[in-house]
Swiss-Prot record:
GO biological process, any: protoporphyrinogen IX biosynthetic process
Organism field: Nostoc punctiforme (strain ATCC 29133 / PCC 73102)
HAMAP family assigned: HemL_aminotrans_3
Localization: Cytoplasm
SUPFAM superfamilies: PLP-dependent transferases
Cofactor(s) required, per the database record: pyridoxal 5'-phosphate
GO molecular function term, any single one: pyridoxal phosphate binding
Pathway it works in: Porphyrin-containing compound metabolism; protoporphyrin-IX biosynthesis; 5-aminolevulinate from L-glutamyl-tRNA(Glu): step 2/2; Porphyrin-containing compound metabolism; chlorophyll biosynthesis
Protein name: Glutamate-1-semialdehyde 2,1-aminomutase
Keywords assigned: Chlorophyll biosynthesis, Cytoplasm, Isomerase, Porphyrin biosynthesis, Pyridoxal phosphate
InterPro entries with a match to the protein in the record: 4pyrrol_synth_GluAld_NH2Trfase, Aminotrans_3, Aminotrans_3_PPA_site, PyrdxlP-dep_Trfase, PyrdxlP-dep_Trfase_major, PyrdxlP-dep_Trfase_small
């Protein structure tokens, strides 16, 4: 087992210097450990299920670059494909055959997607789909759910879960009220609230967007009938249904949450896994809707590095690896063992906890639960989670540094990794 005391002298030095160079010392807020306390770890390299910091400490990683690393870090086949692609250049700024290959793979995999547009991030994908849904319906208002995060575009920064720290409307200074005035919010898993919003705003709502499985308020699964109910309501009121599958796409099933639950939206956003660890995003859906995107139609969207050959190459190889027989059965088995084990250990060591998993995505809340929505999630003992996170980190397990983030496994994780993680969790929970 990893030592219970790690030395992080170099991490502290690097982070101290970073704070003079970048706001908060990071390029994305959650990395600063504000939610869990203590100094963040500065990492040096990754391989498989493991990550090493600048002090040489090794950790079992359950963050997975916040989702993309479903094959494990630096998979040799992905790296080899990237080496070959690099010889041809890093970016063309023009069409390439690689875009066709990945587009065909995405269309074949995801039930809702008949055409796809590649972008550079999940935020870009959600921005593009927002403009498209409004243009197609000629309506301005949208419904999103409390705790669901759809990137940092102004319209979406309303009750955006882990993406922001407050519950204000809007959630960030610098976002004018006008930018969020057309954003309606409802509690996740609450169909009656959604129906009420439709009734109050008849013929004004362009669509409903949601994470079909919430990952940015912690792990929250949809109640039975919730996704089906949204599909029925959007049909009834002439609105579009959009699944933000940036996190769940190719992770909880090869065809994403829509394959897993058998509910097909009109539009879908993707990211993370489809880039194999490189910056990427995509949005796609019905051909009649996607045909409105420029240059085929009037809805403008563009990007200098969109569809760049490196991201396309990594995405193609990652999806090829995921197609191997037994991959998702293995991910389900090891992740269930981890999630069930954490709950059992919490019970045996006297801690109130709830949580669960779907395929390679999991979560743990220090609250009695069940957690159906963001309000339930906020009842968690975040101080206890912070101590749990620090204890796990000091013993060589890297969890997401926030109670309100899902965890991720990969097919690089072994049964031994899970066993070691659970043994460490027992040690930590016994000392909380």
């Amino acid at each position: 087992m990893v030592n219970t005391t790690i030395k992080t002298t170099k991490s502290q030095e690097v982070f101290a210097a970073a704070q003079n160079l970048m706001p908060g010392g990071v390029s994305s807020p959650v990395r600063a450990f504000k939610s869990v306390g203590g100094q963040p770890i500065v990492f040096d390299r990754v391989k498989g299920a493991y990550i090493w910091d600048v002090d040489g400490n090794q950790y079992i990683d359950y963050v997975g670059t916040w989702g993309p690393a479903i094959c494990g870090h630096a998979h040799p086949e992905v790296i080899a494909a990237l080496h070959e692609a690099l010889e041809k250049g890093t970016s063309f700024g023009a069409p390439s055959t690689l875009e066709n290959v990945l587009a065909e793979m995405v269309i074949d995999a995801v039930p809702s997607i008949e055409m796809v547009r590649f972008v550079n991030s999940g935020t870009e994908a959600c921005m593009g789909v927002l403009r498209l849904m409004r243009a197609f319906t000629n309506r301005d208002k949208i419904i999103k759910f409390e705790g669901c995060y759809h990137g940092h575009a102004d319209t979406f920064l309303v009750k955006a879960g882990s993406g922001v720290a407050t519950l204000g409307l809007p959630d960030s200074p610098g976002v004018p009220k006008a930018a969020t005035s057309t954003t309606l919010t409802a509690p996740y898993n609450d169909l009656e609230s959604v129906k009420a919003l439709f009734e109050e705003n008849r013929d004004e709502i362009a669509g409903v967007i949601l994470e079909p499985v919430v990952g940015n308020a912690g792990f929250i699964a949809p109640d039975a009938g919730f996704l089906e109910g949204l599909r029925e309501l959007t049909h009834e009121y002439g609105a579009l249904l959009v699944f933000d599958e940036v996190m769940t796409g190719f992770r909880i099933a090869y065809g994403g949450a829509q394959e897993k639950f058998g509910v097909t939206p009109d539009l879908t956003t993707l990211g993370k896994v489809i880039g194999g660890g490189l910056p990427v995003g995509a949005y796609g859906g019905r051909r009649d809707i996607m045909s409105m995107v420029a240059p085929a139609g009037p809805v403008y969207q563009a990007g200098t590095l969109s569809g760049n050959p490196l991201a396309m190459t990594a995405g193609i190889k990652t999806l090829e690896l995921l197609q191997k027989p037994g991959t998702y059965d293995y991910l389900e088995r090891i992740t269930k063992k981890l999630a069930d084990g954490l709950l059992q250990i919490a019970k045996e060591t006297g801690h109130t906890a709830c949580g669960g998993q779907i395929s390679a995505m999991f979560g743990l809340f220090f609250t009695s639960g069940p957690v159906h929505n963001y309000e339930d999630a906020k009842k968690s003992d975040t101080a206890k989670f912070g101590r749990f996170h620090r204890g796990m980190l000091e013993r060589g397990v890297y969890l997401a540094p926030s109670q309100f983030e899902a965890g991720f496994t990969s097919f690089a994780h072994t049964e031994e990794d899970i066993d070691q993680t659970l043994a460490i969790a027992r040690d930590v929970m016994s000392s909380l």
